[in-house]
């Protein structure tokens, strides 16, 4: 999927969110500024949670709760290793709602056996262009 702007990346997130349900784990990979948080904004917009979005860089996880859905937005970039993820009870969130995990490749062994990986990459010639690849992972 090609995105030409931040707004388009959010739109892709909104469309993707239509198929999500509690228990889904989505791993977002890509360099800083590649669109992971904008995509997450789109997912949150779909669920009517857009007013609260912030990157959880300093918190590790932000919780967005609504009566019919819980969305957990992780940023595990600052974790030393998977043990730290276990120490915060990270894996307990997997069954509580929908989990979006930025930099999830850093905690690969802590991830469930089945998850969705979304990779974001920037185009070197056009700073607004993003390539987004969505794949289902079964370990």
Language model regions located:
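N-terminal pre-Walker A segment at the start of P-loop NTPase domains
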Residues: 1-15
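Conserved nucleotide-sensing/catalytic segment adjacent to the nucleotide-binding pocket
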Residues: 63-105
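Short beta-strand-centered segment that lines the nucleotide-binding/catalytic pocket of NTP-utilizing
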Residues: 49-64
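Phosphate-binding P-loop
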Residues: 17-23
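Conserved lysine of the Walker
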Residues: 36
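The conserved Walker
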Residues: 32
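Short phosphate-coordinating micro-motif centered on Lys-Gly-acidic
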Residues: 45, 91-139
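Hydrophobic anchor at the beta1->P-loop junction of P-loop NTPases
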Residues: 26-28
């Amino acid at each position: 999927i090609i995105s030409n702007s931040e707004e388009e990346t959010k739109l892709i997130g909104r469309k993707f969110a239509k198929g999500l349900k509690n228990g889904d784990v989505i791993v977002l990979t890509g360099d800083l500024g590649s669109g992971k948080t904008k995509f997450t904004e789109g997912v949150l917009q779909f669920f009517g949670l857009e007013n609260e979005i912030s990157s959880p860089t300093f918190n590790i996880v932000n919780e967005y709760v609504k009566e019919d859905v819980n969305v957990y937005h992780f940023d595990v970039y600052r974790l030393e290793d998977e043990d730290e993820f276990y120490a915060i009870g990270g894996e307990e969130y997997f069954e509580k709602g929908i989990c979006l995990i930025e930099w999830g490749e850093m905690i690969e062994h802590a991830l469930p056996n089945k998850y969705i990986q979304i990779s974001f990459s920037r185009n070197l010639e056009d700073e607004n262009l993003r390539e987004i690849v969505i794949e289902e992972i079964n370990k």
